[in-house]
């Protein structure tokens, strides 16, 4: 795959940049660690730029990877606008506010109730005011690992650029015109599975020629190590059938429907308890749905786990 992406780059050792948000516990973040461990560092110099140096997986970054320093402006995106105003980030705060208002208007017009437009607009509206990332470097390949993909497109110099998709686009609400303009500037779009590819192309068929399949990478030694460390948590002590779901608490994962599904299964006479490992913006929604279905004893949120 890398040979295909770098086929026109003549140097012996290639210079790569990977950009992502942070390294909190999550499937995409774990996949990034796997990707970093898979590089042959005799052939590639790999720089990693994170918007924030945060998360439990920071310690998993391979020593051969060059972790670039934080750039203060990019850390603003994760904090409340009111706070960033007090910190003196006036222009970026106003850009975020403009993006928030534009996203709210778009969602209202299209009757979206839980869209990803706000996140996209947060990056889109602040991007013009962000500094360049490694402004003196021209990379052979730059990878934007998590959407939105504006920063690698506009703030990185590279001969080739790839944007990654981890999300099922059949389950999220986006501004198709705006995202089309974002995706079109990339040389390739990396999809983690055939299903993700199919659902992405159902929304963006014009990018069929750009899609390449790069499945999530987990080194064999890492999997063995995690398996040997695994212990069934004391929290999972229910009798009967146990179901475990793991993932980020967001619309695409559909965890908010678990309480109703669990209720229906139990009404049919099956003794099940459903555990949820993860975190995210839908946690309060899931808790509310658990209460509404009266499933407090049978749907249990376990939160973050290092080794689920």
Residue ranges and their predicted role:
Residues 29-34, 241-264, 270, 281-287:
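A conserved mid-protein helix/loop that constitutes part of the nucleotide-sugar donor-binding site
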Residues 141-169:
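Active-site proximal beta-strand in glycosyltransferases
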Residues 160-166, 170, 184-226:
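Donor nucleotide-sugar binding/catalytic pocket of nucleotide-sugar-dependent glycosyltransferases
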Residues 9-15, 225-242, 266-267:
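Nucleotide-sugar donor-binding and catalytic loop/hinge architecture
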Residues 64-68, 287-305:
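Nucleotide-activated donor-binding/catalytic signature segment of Leloir-type glycosyltransferases, i.e.
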Residues 19-20, 192, 214, 245-249, ...:
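Short hydrophobic "strand-cap" motifs at the C-terminus of beta-strands
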Residues 127-138, 150-151, 170-192, 196:
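Membrane-proximal helix-turn-helix segments that form the acceptor-binding/catalytic region
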Residues 18-25, 43-116:
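N-terminal strand-loop element at the rim of the active site
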